[in-house]
UniProtKB/Swiss-Prot annotation:
Function: Removes the pyruvyl group from chorismate to provide 4-hydroxybenzoate (4HB). Involved in the synthesis of glycosylated p-hydroxybenzoic acid methyl esters (p-HBADs) and phenolic glycolipids (PGL) that play important roles in the pathogenesis of mycobacterial infections.
Organism lineage: Bacteria, Bacillati, Actinomycetota, Actinomycetes, Mycobacteriales
Name listed for the protein in its UniProt record: Chorismate pyruvate-lyase
Superkingdom in the source lineage: Bacteria
One Gene Ontology term of the molecular function aspect: chorismate lyase activity
Record keywords, A-Z: Lyase
The reaction(s) this protein catalyses: chorismate = 4-hydroxybenzoate + pyruvate
Length: 210
């Protein structure tokens, strides 16, 4: 199946907690702590340093250097419930050394690290859609998850350049309500609008061609 961008009206039909998470412009982990009513822990599934940036529109024609690719899970510390899966591409050569060290040596959430650094950043409006979960979840043993999730993608800008591209997948099954069934029955488009003037096509995992 492909992915379909959600309109504002369709987003309003999501469960209240899911709407809060999708709309938050702050640190997702902090908000999820409140929504889930428990401490949230970060489980880094995969982290690797790429010498060459992937060929995606968000990074096109930019001399950005090395990329840190990070795939994580956000889970309840006590319950073990998986709430969110996330993928990030981080342009580490455009960030202060201290941030790079925290990213590579600790399990702290990216949002927490960036907030603590106090560097000036701007988060672009996120694009929200319903679509498939990333394929790497199955690769690491998560076979029994729902096939569809609410996803969002955004870029974080610092110094006039994108330094982080994050894609988050919210597991609908862990929230009380779900969007109306017609959301999954509508005509799908696998074009994703980044709201930065770029459009690109998703095929399975967002960064499958890395």
């Amino acid at each position: 199946m492909t992915n379909r961008t959600l309109s504002r009206e369709e987003i309003r039909k999501l469960d209240r907690d899911l709407r809060i998470l999708v709309a938050t412009n702050g640190t997702l982990t902090r908000v999820l702590n409140v929504v889930a009513n428990e401490e949230i822990v970060v489980d880094i599934i995969n982290q690797q340093l790429l010498d060459v940036a992937p060929k995606i529109p968000e990074l096109e024609n930019l001399k950005i250097g090395r990329i840190l690719q990070r795939d994580i899970l956000l889970k309840g510390q006590k319950s073990g419930i998986l709430f969110v899966a996330a993928e990030s591409l981080i342009v580490i050569d455009l960030l202060p050394t201290a941030i790079t060290t925290y990213l590579t040596k600790t399990h702290h959430p990216i949002g927490e690290i960036m907030a603590a650094s106090r560097i000036e950043t701007y988060k672009e409006d996120a694009q929200v859609w319903i679509g498939d979960l990333p394929c790497w979840l199955a690769d690491y043993g998560y076979w029994d998850l729902p096939k569809r999730a609410v996803g969002r993608r955004y870029r974080i800008i610092a110094g006039g350049q994108p330094v982080i591209i994050t894609t988050e997948y919210f597991l609908r099954s862990v929230f009380q309500d779900t969007p109306r069934e017609e959301l999954d029955r509508c005509q799908y488009s696998n074009d994703i609008d980044t709201r930065s003037g770029d459009r690109f096509v998703l095929h399975g995992r967002v960064f499958k061609n890395l």
